[in-house]
């Protein structure tokens, strides 16, 4: 195959990717359970636009738009997980926020499917 092996054929990297995705994501059902049983153990962060947040959001979610994230690091906790969501499964805003937060040492999970899946 040579040094230009198709990345999709690299089963070791694929295994690591999917294992990490399972560890750092939560589905709507899992989030509903956390809200019901242990709402104080995490922060829920909606990174969508203001109008979308006002039109509807997940209970207990704080609004921190993606483009204002760095101005609001003080709202997050390093002592509990910060669950981030954006619009839908195709939206990358939550992942981009997760990168920024983890660079600063904040524990993060992503809601699979975003608000649309909720």
Residue spans of the language-model regions?
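Catalytic cysteine-centered active loop of the rhodanese-like fold, especially the PTP/DSP P-loop
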Residues: 73-118
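Conserved beta-strand positions in the Rossmann-like core of class I SAM-dependent methyltransferases
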Residues: 43, 62, 109
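Flexible, polar/low-complexity N-terminal or interdomain linker segments that lie immediately upstream
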Residues: 1-43, 48-52
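Short loop/helix-cap segments at secondary-structure boundaries that form the rim of catalytic
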Residues: 53-59, 76
